[in-house]
Amino acid sequence: MSSFISYRMFLCSSMPWHAAIAIVRIKLLSLVLLLFSTTVLGKTANTEQAHIADTIHILPKTGLALYPLYEGLHDRLAVRYAYAVWQGKEGIRLPQYGLSEQRHSLYATGATRQQKWGAHGYAEYAHGQRTQVRSIAMAQPERFYPYIVLDTSKRALTREEYQLGGTLSYVWHDLGVGIGGSFAGTTQFGKKDPRPLARIGDFSTLLALSYRLSHYVLAAQGDYSYYSESFAQTNKKEDRQDYVYYHLGLGLYDHELSVQKRSESVKYIFAEYALTLQAAPQQRYLPLVQIAYNHNNAFGRTNLYTKIAETEEDKLQAKLFFPFIFSAQRLEVGVHVDYAQRTGYEIDYYTHQVNTSPNITEEREYHRVAAWKGIQSHYKAHLSYRYAMPSALFHLGYEGGLASLQTRHGQYYFEQRRSVQNLFATYRRYYAHYDWLFCLQGLWTQSVQKRVLWAREARFFAQLQNSIELYYNEPHYGLQATFEGGYRITPAQRIAFALTGGFERIGGSSEPAWLWELALRYGFLNRR
């Protein structure tokens, strides 16, 4: 669960925004690229306009990773550069994201559909900085717990990210098959100290199958992901570190584990398996059904290759959508359920002598206990209405639901439910060679139930607990607006300029968090 509007599900783009990241007094939210309008839309039919200009679509793509096989013959390329700034306050985001960020990012994606095969891929590089980062200095702490290093300093961190991925698919009669993969890397280091605090390698691979029936396309996709992070840190004399029980932003702490350490070096391993099944309609008024199961295992280990703690997590996701198409109008209604359960294990070791001459010893596990449990669920409803006019497109959407988070370690617990509501409206206007778009988004979250018992901790822990209480339990209000102007160089090429601004307020505070972003886009789309 994120805190800022643009960190939510509905954005003024055809893909979700990247998570916020990076610099001195600032933080970003990356608006990801639109599928570009590349025809003289003022002179085309409504159905063609709706397809090209559709920048917000809540329905999953038909065929999952094989989606190019179920589109018309085309070649598509989109490139986007963005510069974004975020300035916030305590409680708007979780402590590990800092109080301000700034980021530059360059993103490119492309796809092609030929007679017998299709392919799509993407690449991205981003460089950013964040300031006043307190607590956990890992790159992705939510993936690894119960063992997490908690740092009590406030740091200025620089973060570099890159990723590359894609899928190649082939169709034979009604059968489609595809293979794909991706690699992502992140390096995070202090602004004054160039030694890396964290290095990340994230590799994933997938295999997908699909089959076309008279009324449906059936698709199945299996994914495997392997993630590792090397983490090293040197502290000031007065700093403390703690091993944290952590669940999607929430830590429950055992003060008996708290230690004063000048340095720490840990390696984290994360492995994930996922299976997704989908039935996508090929005719009007039929529902889309999609279910997914995910299992992952994560642990941290020292330089002695000893597991400190380990977690097991199971996730279940279900989606049901009903699309209704009436000539120039389209209505989509759906429900979405997410459920995740994670268990953390504490591991104890004893020293075993393997050989006396020479003297060789090793650490052997002798005791494992399920000390930590966490459950998260999210129930959402979706509603989307789109109306295509001869030279314009109007789109209105809503996503709302109830999110629940429960964590427990020993006698300590944190239980919370909150209502999350998102609303967006988009209007796009087409001319012979120009077009413009205006998108307005609103966010509101409200805690409806909470129950918590914190351990009695030191002052810096109390500050961290206060930030978590603000984030989860105080109401959040936000508004964001995007204006984009585009020019068609040729019938197949388009360039665009977009400016985004927004704010978010927590509770009755008079100090909001501010966001602004500048984006430049180039798009190419050739339909055959």
Which residues are covered by each model-predicted region?
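N-terminal, post-signal peptide beta-strand-biased segments of exported outer-membrane/organellar beta-barrel
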Residues: 41-131
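Outer-envelope beta-barrel architecture signal
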Residues: 73-80, 115-121, 173-177, 214-220, ...
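Transmembrane beta-barrel strands of outer-membrane/channel proteins
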Residues: 77-87, 121-127, 170, 179-185, ...
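Outer-membrane beta-barrel translocator domains and adjoining extracellular loop/strand segments
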Residues: 90-96, 132-138, 189-197, 231-237, ...
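Residues that define the transmembrane beta-barrel architecture of outer-membrane proteins
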Residues: 100-106, 158-164, 197-205, 267-273, ...
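Short, flexible helix-coil linker/hinge segments at the edges of structured domains or between repeats
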Residues: 134-148, 223-269, 297-310, 351-361
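Long, internal scaffold/assembly segments composed of regular secondary structure
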Residues: 257-393
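Outer-membrane beta-barrel "beta-signal"
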Residues: 512-528
